[in-house]
Amino acid sequence: MFSYYFQGLALGAAMILPLGPQNAFVMNQGIRRQYHIMIALLCAISDLVLICAGIFGGSALLMQSPWLLALVTWGGVAFLLWYGFGAFKTAMSSNIELASAEVMKQGRWKIIATMLAVTWLNPHVYLDTFVVLGSLGGQLDVEPKRWFALGTISASFLWFFGLALLAAWLAPRLRTAKAQRIINLVVGCVMWFIALQLARDGIAHAQALFS
């Protein structure tokens, strides 16, 4: 059964490693050392719920409801554009230290709300967990399916906690004005690139719905 566990671990790692909204947010919270462990835990728990839903049958709901998929897609586009704009605004600020200090004033609940939006308004998360993991894990028997799910969940927990702790450890080097400008520019570009990709997918889905 360990072979199924390591298959899930490898696939989960491959899907979670690329820089996306979730990883960027966890990394930034780690650099700020601001509730970064809590955010890593909440991201991992969110992934646990999504992975279990995808592997144990939830994928059918999303795939059979094109309107729900369209709603998630365009909600994700709007959020990513807003999040990217905030990153660009910080990067272009004449006094980036002051802009970063303003971000640090955010309360716990606002940070949690942003984390939930970054996770649950990202259609790529549903495609990864419901479509990819659902199609692969859903074909397995009950016991192998559990080990496969455990492997992918382990990848999420290891990655998010590792990323948060590594970012916090490197914080003194990454908190400089130059580093903050570069990080925010990269995050803004990635967020807008993903938003454009999602918008293209959303237009294709809309054309399919109304054709």
Swiss-Prot record:
Which topology term describes how it sits in the membrane? Multi-pass membrane protein
Relate the outcome reported for changing F160S: Loss of transport activity
> Which BP terms from GO are recorded?
amino acid transport; L-arginine transmembrane transport
User: Where is this protein localized, as stated in its record?
Assistant: Cell inner membrane
Cytoplasmic compartment segments: 1-38, 92-102, 171-173
UniProt lists the family membership as follows: Belongs to the LysE/ArgO transporter (TC 2.A.75) family.
The protein's name is: Arginine exporter protein ArgO
Provenance organism: Escherichia coli (strain K12)
Encoded by which gene?
A: argO
